[in-house]
Curated annotation (Swiss-Prot):
Catalytic activity of the protein: (Z)-3-ureidoacrylate + H2O + H(+) = (Z)-3-aminoacrylate + NH4(+) + CO2; (Z)-3-ureidoacrylate + H2O = (Z)-3-aminoacrylate + carbamate + H(+); (Z)-2-methylureidoacrylate + H2O + H(+) = (Z)-2-methylaminoacrylate + NH4(+) + CO2
GO molecular function list: hydrolase activity, acting on carbon-nitrogen (but not peptide) bonds, in linear amides
Pfam families membership: Isochorismatase
InterPro entries tied to this protein: Isochorismatase-like_dom, Isochorismatase-like_hydrls, Isochorismatase-like_sf, RutB
Name recorded for this polypeptide: Ureidoacrylate amidohydrolase RutB
KW Magnesium (keyword) present: no
Enzyme Commission identifier(s): 3.5.1.110
């Protein structure tokens, strides 16, 4: 099995594509589109288009190299029972739930399964063989089969893309760290919820304490046929 060398911060990371997964976190209309939840809650989504294109590029490279592709969709049932009631901290901290309480006309529209907000953006489409998982909280490891599905495939290295870097991406990468997964985030294939310093703080946390940081060009270079041929 071939291993590739990915240039990253704070140091390069070596992994076998067949034992690695590209994780696409919450690339839904809610997080990346005008009129979606983040936009309606007052977060800037005006610069997500390049992120979408970079994720498309990363997905294509990962698929060609034989990596597993995992797509997450964050949200709940249309009655929001899965979101938790007042006894859950999620009820009090979820900006989607708070926005709907402020604007009752949005109830049943934000992050509700089956709705436009919940759907992946049109530019990104899972293919047969990809893993598509719903998740009810920020971390993709919480109340999902992600861990068991990865272990069944002998996957130990996770490459992260998606929105939001400082919330669901970082939360999932951190939980993976605690479960002994090696996590690397492609910084130009992610976008923060909040001001730019939130992106920089999340990337600092990841490269300093929990994982590695790279970018889409370096990722594609590492997975290119020429690179794979050199190490075959």
């Amino acid at each position: 099995m071939n291993a590739v060398n990915l240039m990253a911060r704070p140091e390069a990371l070596t992994f076998a594509p067949e034992q690695s997964a590209l994780i696409v976190v919450d690339m839904q209309n809610a997080y990346a589109s005008q009129g979606g939840y983040l936009d309606l809650a007052g977060f800037d989504v005006s610069t997500t288009a390049p992120v979408i294109e970079n994720i498309k590029t990363a997905v294509a490279a990962a698929r060609e190299a034989g990596m597993t592709i995992v797509w997450f969709q964050n949200g709940w049932d249309s009655d929001y029972l899965e979101a938790g009631g007042p006894g859950s901290p999620n009820f009090h901290k979820s900006n989607a739930l708070k926005t709907m309480r402020r604007r009752p006309e949005l109830h049943g529209k934000l992050l509700a399964k089956g709705g436009w907000d919940y759907q992946l953006v049109d530019e990104l489409t899972p293919l047969p063989g990809d893993i598509v998982l719903p998740k009810p909280r920020y971390s993709g490891f919480f109340n999902t089969p992600l861990d068991s599905m990865l272990r069944a495939r002998n996957i130990r290295h996770l490459v992260f893309t998606g929105i939001a870097t400082n919330v669901c991406v970082e939360s999932t990468l951190r939980d993976g760290f605690f479960l002994e997964y090696f996590g690397v985030v492609l910084e130009d294939a992610t976008h923060q919820a909040g001001p730019p310093f939130a992106q920089q703080a999340a990337l600092f946390n990841i490269e300093t304490f929990f994982g590695w940081v790279s970018d889409v060009q370096r990722f594609c270079d590492a997975l290119s046929p020429a690179a794979l041929a050199r190490i075959a």
